[in-house]
Amino acid sequence: MPTYDNHHALKGLTLGQPTEYHDTYQPALLQAVPRRLNREPLGLYPDSLPFGGADIWTLYELSWLNSKGVPQVAVGEVVLDASSINLIESKSFKLYLNSFNQTKFANWGEVRQILERDLSACAAGKVSVALFRLHEIEGQPVGHFDGYCIDEQDIVIDSYAFDAGYLHNAVGNEIVEEQLVSHLLKSNCLITNQPDWGTVQISYRGPRIQREALLRYLVSFRQHNEFHEQCVERIFSDILRYCQPESLSVYARYTRRGGLDINPWRSNTHFTPGRSRLVRQ
């Protein structure tokens, strides 16, 4: 399992530490985690990644002051390309956003540009930001993942230790194209051990994956410690290795914490992720 959990790159994170909250703009609050920490143990390297994708963040607690001192509120969407050198640590992201609270900005466009600049610098990669006024997104329906939900199987599970071996010999001879969904994805934060709850959609074309084996595999994340983005890349890599589909997309949407939710997707084919929040978001 992860050999990087005590890596020096994680030692300075504010995550899990007593924290001072700032309400005036401080970009230095952002903290990066190198993606290579979990990619290298999986045999993933920048010049030969088997997937594209992004981490889609939703910002529910974003506020600043306009030039006249009147508070502004927005919902933000940040798309961080999976090819970036770093991922952005979520608690530092929250603290950074808090630093906007008592800071004056000329207009919404300035806020968006500053967010893009700072987040791109932290991630060392491409970041896009959209800001929405509340009336623009009020009334949007709760979405759902297309596909067959594998959660209602009548099986006994008594082991919750991560085990990619559940996917070994877990395919048949029939070639199919399908989408499978589970709401039972749960892992733990790498630093704090706090639970992370998610729904995952697996879209593939290839030998049919045994649904019992896949469910056992996903449930085995239940006591596993990794960041959201890392779990999705592990799922993608394990399915690609053991099940050898012709095409594969893995998309997870996690419940929010600290006013943020993280929704990573990875794919080796054309894939357009839905943006609607799910029922637990």
UniProtKB/Swiss-Prot annotation:
<feature type="binding site">
    <location>
        <begin position="90"/>
        <end position="91"/>
    </location>
    <ligand>
        <name>NADPH</name>
    </ligand>
</feature>
<feature type="active site" description="Proton donor">
    <location>
        <position position="196"/>
    </location>
</feature>
<dbReference type="Pfam" id="PF14489">
    <property type="entry name" value="QueF"/>
</dbReference>
<dbReference type="Pfam" id="PF14819">
    <property type="entry name" value="QueF_N"/>
</dbReference>
<keyword id="KW-0963">Cytoplasm</keyword>
<dbReference type="InterPro" id="IPR043133">
    <property type="entry name" value="GTP-CH-I_C/QueF"/>
</dbReference>
<feature type="active site" description="Thioimide intermediate">
    <location>
        <position position="189"/>
    </location>
</feature>
<comment type="similarity">
    <text>Belongs to the GTP cyclohydrolase I family. QueF type 2 subfamily.</text>
</comment>
<keyword id="KW-0521">NADP</keyword>
<comment type="subunit">
    <text>Homodimer.</text>
</comment>
<feature type="binding site">
    <location>
        <begin position="228"/>
        <end position="229"/>
    </location>
    <ligand>
        <name>substrate</name>
    </ligand>
</feature>
<comment type="pathway">
    <text>tRNA modification; tRNA-queuosine biosynthesis.</text>
</comment>
<comment type="function">
    <text>Catalyzes the NADPH-dependent reduction of 7-cyano-7-deazaguanine (preQ0) to 7-aminomethyl-7-deazaguanine (preQ1).</text>
</comment>
<dbReference type="InterPro" id="IPR050084">
    <property type="entry name" value="NADPH_dep_7-cyano-7-deazaG_red"/>
</dbReference>
<dbReference type="InterPro" id="IPR029139">
    <property type="entry name" value="QueF_N"/>
</dbReference>
<dbReference type="InterPro" id="IPR016428">
    <property type="entry name" value="QueF_type2"/>
</dbReference>
<dbReference type="GO" id="GO:0005737">
    <property type="term" value="C:cytoplasm"/>
</dbReference>
<feature type="binding site">
    <location>
        <begin position="88"/>
        <end position="90"/>
    </location>
    <ligand>
        <name>substrate</name>
    </ligand>
</feature>
<feature type="binding site">
    <location>
        <begin position="257"/>
        <end position="258"/>
    </location>
    <ligand>
        <name>NADPH</name>
    </ligand>
</feature>
<dbReference type="GO" id="GO:0006400">
    <property type="term" value="P:tRNA modification"/>
</dbReference>
<dbReference type="GO" id="GO:0008616">
    <property type="term" value="P:queuosine biosynthetic process"/>
</dbReference>
<keyword id="KW-0560">Oxidoreductase</keyword>
<keyword id="KW-0671">Queuosine biosynthesis</keyword>
<dbReference type="InterPro" id="IPR029500">
    <property type="entry name" value="QueF"/>
</dbReference>
<protein>
    <recommendedName>
        <fullName>NADPH-dependent 7-cyano-7-deazaguanine reductase</fullName>
        <ecNumber>1.7.1.13</ecNumber>
    </recommendedName>
</protein>
<dbReference type="GO" id="GO:0033739">
    <property type="term" value="F:preQ1 synthase activity"/>
</dbReference>
